[in-house]
Amino acid sequence: MKKIIDNYNAWAYQYDNNINPTRDLDKTVTKESLSNIDFFKVLELGCGSGKNTEWIITKADKLVGLDFSKNMLELARKKITSKKVTFINADINEKWPINNNSFDLATINLTLEHIEILDHVFNSLFMKLVQGGKCFICELHPKKQLAGSKAQFEENGTEIVLDVFQHSEQDYIQSAEKAGFNLLAKKDWYDSEEDIPRLISFLFEKPK
């Protein structure tokens, strides 16, 4: 995990500005998927530079963003100064420094591909959400991964490819359901001119 964290700390300086169709589509997917859902207290895992935070806080009363990259969070804090937002440097593989039963929405974007064991994340999410709380996930599509796509960036002329773990659609669903969630929706998201979906999204709910 340290290598992945170091890579994201290096990537942070260009993350918002380089050509990245996965990042851009994820932003669109998040807005489209959550625009008709009411939420007030949000837990954003893997908030990164705050690319989705900016829109989410237009609907939320409070947001807590967790990320393992200090440099990404530095960008987020410069970009977002709202008192509604708290950013915390934390590794979601470990215990999360937030209270249980505190949020009605959790979001995870382009993060779980860097997590080898999903169960800890879903179990923790289940505890942090209130009854009826929803969990939105958007990740690189398993088919896109199998085609060789990985998170990567260029630094000083050298291509840096980040370590990722392959998770199938069923891996996400089974881990979430094992934690107690119900699946509400699943959708494939495409680039305009590609046959293979770039992203996959899930919406889960903690039973009321």
Residues covered by each model-derived region:
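Conserved class I S-adenosyl-L-methionine
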Residues: 1-37, 39-46, 51, 55, 75, 136-163, ...
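Class I SAM-dependent methyltransferase SAM/SAH-binding core
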Residues: 47-94
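A short acidic, Gly/Pro-enriched loop at the edge of an enzyme's catalytic core
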Residues: 97-105
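A short glycine-rich, Lys/Arg-flanked "PGG" loop and its adjoining helix->strand segment in the class I
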Residues: 119-131
